[in-house]
Amino acid sequence: MRRNRAAPAGTVHSLSVDSGVLKSNRLGDPTTRDVPVYVPHDHDGAGLPLLVDLAGFTSGGPAHAGWKNFGENLPQRLDRLIAEGAMPPSVVAMPDCFTRLGGNQYINSDAMGRWEDFLIDEMVPEVERRFGCGGEGRRGLFGKSSGGYGSIVHAMRRPDCWAAAACLSGDMAFELCYLPAMPGVLRTLAKKDGSIETFITDFEAGPKWSGGDIHSLMTLAMAATYDPDPDPDAFCGIRLPVDMETCEIIEERWTNWLSRDPVVMADSHAGNLKRLRALWIECGKADQYNLLYGARRLQRKLAAAGVEHVYEEFDDNHSGLDYRLDRCLPFLAKALD
């Protein structure tokens, strides 16, 4: 979709949030975070719903507001959808939650940092104070992949804050999306004498990274998120849920991972989702990370629990899915308007 230059352009404001809760992160990541905030044309934001955009792994909110080839960035997409009357005017915050390990799952972790607390207790209040938007019953969040994971988990855990959520190809059914990557991670680490620290420091110093390196880093980030090593001397708080020599699952650690799996969490948190005004879940039928099967499992559990939601499957994989926002953004904004 090429940009519709006839659509009146909104304004992207630059906001900076100095976090107190992120100071405990073990990665050495910055605690002052940029938050581009989109306000529609001819509005100052007052009285509008607030949507929060959670970026996928290796990305961050500011990237969604930047120049884009062959298509629209997020503000331009919002301009078009609002101008066409497809969605009501809404304020959209695009926080920078990028980390040393390449991304974020947007939950609290002793290693990665208290990202759930940052978003809910620090960023949202600052955006609402500055623009007069959102408020109880008028906040939603959306994201794809890691951002989709963050959206559904926030909705499960904090319906007191969020009234609507969209999970696009979110991480779930961990035994299908994460365990298959473990042998490759071990092979990568074996080239560094099994040292996680050496791999990461070499990655940071290197002029170029392979796709395999990125995927290995992503798996290490998941380890720091779902099962941070309690040993304060562990580099970046990372330990894997498998034996480094045999790739056998270490049950105690893997159980910690599974406790953060949305499919597992649905057993105890589905009731919270009933408090939402709107819930959207979708996944591509050719998703290369096997996320379709997790989405189907989650959908069945929610249906059995009587949770109202929209569930869609579509003919595509995990990549280049920004066009799917044309479906879920109007859905969220209308529910919050």
Model-derived segments and spans:
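Non-catalytic cap/lid and distal C-terminal segments of serine-dependent acyl enzymes
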Residues: 1-337
